[in-house]
């Protein structure tokens, strides 16, 4: 859900930003790898937190489940500090590797710095989402995912184009709308958590340095993070190649990857959703349920991927029209989607 939401944020940003011109769309595309790095770390470690919680709950050890949730929040704070420092130090030098166009560089730098320096909303929101998933509260995560997306969709045109008396902030407005959507979802998670009683409790009394649980979180989280980072590395390499030809190709690549990931994300969501179920049943020794969950999840994911492939092949022009594509963007984009 968190990954799907992030891709929806990116696509909505790109649809509105494309109205500002190809340079603005290129700027958001160049910012994507760094933005995805935040997501990769948050989701990867979040998966580790969720896995640890579900395993300990399945084994009937509530105390360790509480400790895993609390340590997960503490580790998220450390990651948040790291990304703020990164946003202030490496974002502009990184972006200079891919463009010397001053307008594109300025817009990309502003967008990236806002998203990285205010990344606490995304990081903590995803941590809470994974904690809720770890205890099986899938409906709540879905509702709050939708709430954050709605806030972003409403604010994007207002802040980008300056509606309802707000100043027109352009690309910066897209970034601000994104982080406000993330922070809104985080605040809703905190409110829901504090007003209800759940299977795990986050508290300072559970904040104990437990090497085994930390190792458990990172042993699952780091491989997941690395796997999710690979597309960012690929996109960065391709951006460096394509900028030698035309900034339009960078914009096309950005649109293509966001659409590709958006199509892929429902299948990924199925896989993410099966993890706490598998973890709980594995901890309870229910091997037959583990096998049936894996089988059903993989079949459903394959069906979703097939549907996405058919849409991309059949309706590429209609999809690209959402991004206000000019002739050059449309021509290259249709080829990329197909």
Language-model segments: which ranges?
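Residue-level recognition of transmembrane alpha-helices
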Residues: 29-32, 76, 112-115, 119, ...
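Alpha-helical transmembrane segments of multi-pass membrane proteins
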Residues: 102-128, 259-261, 267, 327-338
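Small-residue-rich hydrophobic transmembrane alpha-helices
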Residues: 25-85, 122-141, 239, 252-316
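Interhelical loop/hinge segments that connect adjacent transmembrane helices in multipass membrane
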Residues: 175-178, 190-231
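Short membrane-interface helical motifs at transmembrane helix boundaries
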Residues: 82-113, 307-334
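Membrane-interface helix-loop junctions in multi-pass transport and translocation proteins
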Residues: 139, 150-187, 316, 322, ...
């Amino acid at each position: 859900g968190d990954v799907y939401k992030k891709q929806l944020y990116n696509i909505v940003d790109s649809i509105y930003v494309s109205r500002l011109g190809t340079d603005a769309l290129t700027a958001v595309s160049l910012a994507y790898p760094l933005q995805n790095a935040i997501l990769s770390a948050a989701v990867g470690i979040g998966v580790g937190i969720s896995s640890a919680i579900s395993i300990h709950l399945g084994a009937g050890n509530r105390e360790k489940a509480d400790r895993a949730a609390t340590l997960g929040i503490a580790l998220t704070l450390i990651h948040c500090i790291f990304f703020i420092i990164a946003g202030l130090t490496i974002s502009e030098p990184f972006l200079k590797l891919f463009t010397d166009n001053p307008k594109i560089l300025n817009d990309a730098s502003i967008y990236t710095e806002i998203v990285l320096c205010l990344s606490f909303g995304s990081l903590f929101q995803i941590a809470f989402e994974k904690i809720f998933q770890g205890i099986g509260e899938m409906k709540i995560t879905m509702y709050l995912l939708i709430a954050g997306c709605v806030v972003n969709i409403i604010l994007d045109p207002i802040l980008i184009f300056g509606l309802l008396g707000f100043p027109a902030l352009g690309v910066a407005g897209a970034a601000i709308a994104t982080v406000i959507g993330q922070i809104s979802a985080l605040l809703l998670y905190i409110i829901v958590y504090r007003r209800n009683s759940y299977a795990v409790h986050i508290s300072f009394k559970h904040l104990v340095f437990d090497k085994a649980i930390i190792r458990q979180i990172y042993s699952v989280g780091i491989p997941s993070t690395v796997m999710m980072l690979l597309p960012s590395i690929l996109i960065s390499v391709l951006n460096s190649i394509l900028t030698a030809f035309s900034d339009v190709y960078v914009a096309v690549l950005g649109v293509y990857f966001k659409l590709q990931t958006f199509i892929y994300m429902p299948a990924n969501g199925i896989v993410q959703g099966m993890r706490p179920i598998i973890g709980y049943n594995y901890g309870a020794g229910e091997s037959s349920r583990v096998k049936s969950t894996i089988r059903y999840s993989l079949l459903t994911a394959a069906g979703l991927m097939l549907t996405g492939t058919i849409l991309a092949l059949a309706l590429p022009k209609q999809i690209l029209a959402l991004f206000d594509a000019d002739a050059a963007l449309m021509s290259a984009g249709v080829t990329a989607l197909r």
